[in-house]
Structure formats: structure tokens, C-alpha cells
Swiss-Prot record:
This is Ubiquitin carboxyl-terminal hydrolase 14. InterPro entries: Papain-like_cys_pep_sf, Peptidase_C19_UCH, Ubiquitin-like_dom, Ubiquitin-like_domsf, UBP14-like, USP_CS, USP_dom. Residues 467-489 are annotated as: Disordered. The keyword Iron-sulfur does not apply. The active site is at 111 (nucleophile), 409 (proton acceptor). CDD domains: Peptidase_C19A, Ubl_USP14_like. The gene is usp-14. It comes from Caenorhabditis elegans.
Amino acid sequence: MPIVNVKWQKEKYVVEVDTSAPPMVFKAQLFALTQVVPERQKVVIMGRTLGDDDWEGITIKENMTIMMMGSVGEIPKPPTVLEKKQANRDKQAEEISALYPCGLANLGNTCYFNSCVQMLKEVNELVLKPAEEMRIREHNDRLCHNLATLFNSLRDKDRALRSKGEPIKPFAAILTLSDSFPQFEKFKQQDANECLVSIMSNVTRIYGLSGWNIESLFRIQTETTMKCLESDEVSEKKVERNNQLTCYVNQDVRFLQTGIKAGFEEEMTRNSEELNRDAKWQKNTQISRLPKYLTVNINRFFYKESTKTNAKILKSVQFPMQLDTYDLCSQELKDKLVARRADIKLEEDAKLERELRKKVLDKEQGDKIFDDGVALPTAFEDDAGSNNSGFYDLKGIITHKGRSSQDGHYVAWMRSSEDGKWRLFDDEHVTVVDEEAILKTSGGGDWHSAYVLLYEARVIKQFPELPPAPVPTEVAADTAEPMEVSEKQ
């Protein structure tokens, strides 16, 4: 597919054109870049105006220049005096609201896709610079290219200011999603976790071909052994790689860690060669490699034959804001985690010492010593993208509200990589929320239930030793030795 240069006002964009698709798809790409709706676009190619339905009479050549005309909104009229006063009055409020991250418009049952994109866009390694996007285009994968463009648009503060918080309409990405994965029919509700897994498989593969080892950031490695409970027979160790852990939900599961362990330790019936019959076996799985980003699917849906739907388990499953995976790991990995975990105690002691010191210093001096920690590496030196402590901080959640995976509503709750605040991304609506709202999504009713969790490796800081504390003036005066006075002879 040819790559062309599109000039619009003072901007210039490099766009890949698929002439096998209707021109409306190309105009949707331009809309994603400029926010000029297709109805207001006038695209001129070699003196001809491009229509919406076909490319008849128009030939697209590599690196050719295409002109586009059209404004984002209505052509503004000269403001009246009252309008100028109102604009000045609202300027500060508009700038603050414009800095809120952009939402994604629901194009018709596309909330499942929007929540996945809002989750992945907070993974800093997936947000590329414009020059880096060119390397993605070289692999002729339109879905990955459109997703990379979408991640950038959602993290672009300048774009947010220009659009004043207007939501992005992800036409191009939705169209190419269904092309790459036919199970996601256009504008039909789908399973958000299935969508997330599909997007991650595409992105990790194409980014990897382009020189970025994204796969290592999500890869979990497990070791599984099987032991016969009726003999001494033990199966060979099986090593598997996955991009996600599963929390199985049953009547005994109330906490996330319990549900994960339920899948790691199971009894089952299988053939025993030693006994020459079926026997009971114990399966034991342990994690031998932890990634920087850990995704966990709370397995809330099951196929209900009577209604022929993926019905939802409404049971509450509590999840932590800080997750410790140490007990899920193999002994070999546990031994490797010990060193960085010891740094956590040192970090906590240093923070406590600084809190006490701040009480005897002014605010400016106290802030300086409190923020003097240096972040330690979160990965092992010989394993990029790993987690060397076993500790994670919750970064985001995809929740579902409804009774089956094919209906209801999906939203994303994300902690910003920039300001650390939690925000609810409900399609085009973006609001700031607190941790209490996050913890309420554990389930147990018809409210939003956590379905997919994204954890990020905890950043541990190393603090320098503080200088001796200054002695308060009053104390120094009280403890000073009395001066000797000589007696007159």
C-alpha cells in the first residue's frame, strides 16, 4: 500500500492509503489525525476531488502529496464584546478541562474496545514518537499502525488543548480490528478480555519486528508438575509462557490471590502408566518469571446452556492496590527476589526518618530531603522487562456492568502515568475518581465488577543517609555550658 503526504493547513501528515477499501476509510484516517469530520473534508488529488465511495479516475502514487481542506468546527464569526468577556472569564476553566485525557466515542457497542485502548495507552512503552511510527508502517499491519496512532493521540496534551476535550472517534482502528480478527464483528458487543488478548498479540508481534521487545514486558513463565496421589509417579516439568494470569471464581474464592492459586493447585483424574489405570493426580504450578506489567483476568463468565449466553458470576472478589506475588513463585525465583525485597525495608525506614525530620524543618527544606530518593531498577540485569521484587502496584482495571459478556457495558479505570490520579474512562466521558471508588468494583451485585486488572512492577527507591539533625535554637541555649566568671582578688 502506498504511503502519501497529506497537507492540511500548516500541518503535514504521512498516511498509508489502502485503495482496496472505500475512500471513506482514508477519510476516517485523516479524521483521526486532524479531527476534521469526513463530511467537512475536501481531499484533492492531482486536481480531482476525492469522493466517498470509490477511487474512480484517481491514481495513488508512492510519496505523492495530497491536499486536504476543511475546518475542525464551524467557521468562527467575529466575537462580540460580550463574547470576548465571557471567553476571558472561562479561559482558565477551559484550559483546565482541556488537560483532561481525551475519551473515545462509542461508535455503537464499541465500549469493549475503548476500555482496552484506554488501558494499554497507559503502558509508556507502547506510546511511540512520530518518527518511530514509521518503523511500524514498514510491516504493513494496519491494525498495529492505527493502534499506535491512537495511543499517541490519547497521550498528546497539545491535541487535547486543540480539541478542548472532544472525544476521539476511532473509526480506522475499529475497522482494522475486525479485518485482523473476524470474530470482532463491527459495532457488536464483544468480550473485552478477548479483545485485549488479541490486541496484545498483534502489538507485541509487530512492535517486536520493528525493534521493540514489548513481549518481555508482559511475559509470564510458569512451571507445572503433576504427581500421582496413588503412587510415586511424577510427570516431567512443563514450562509455559503466557501474557495473563487467571483468577478462577468459585464459592470459596473471596480474594484475588486465592482465585489465582485455585488454578495453580488442582486435583484431576488421568491415566497412570505405573498403575495402568486412571488415578488421581495433583497439579502444581509455580511462576518462574514475572513481567513488568502483570494482567489478571477474573474469570467471571461461564456458558449457560439454558440461555445460550456467557452468564456472569456476580460474586465479590477483592483485589489489592499492592499485590505481592512471592507465594506464587518457584523456589528458584524466590531466591532471586530476596535482594530487591530487602531494599523495601530500607526504603520504608528512610521515608519514616524523613517524615520525622520534616517536623523540625521548614516546608522547603523538608520537601527537598523527602524527594531525594533514586529509583532502583525494577528488572533483573540479565532479563529486560522482568520484575525483580515480586511487588506490584495496581495501574488499571476494566470493569463490566451487566449479566453476560455479550451485553452490558465496559469501562476502564486507570491511574495516570503522569500525575498518579485515578480516572474513569466511560467512552467519551472522563472523570477523576478516588481509590475508594476503585475498591468498590470488586463485584457482588449489578454495579461495575472488575474483569481485567493491570499491575505494574513497584518502583523502589534508595535514599541517601541524612546528615545529623539540626539542634533547635531553644534546646541549644538550654544545654550551653555556663561561662566561668573570674573572682576579683
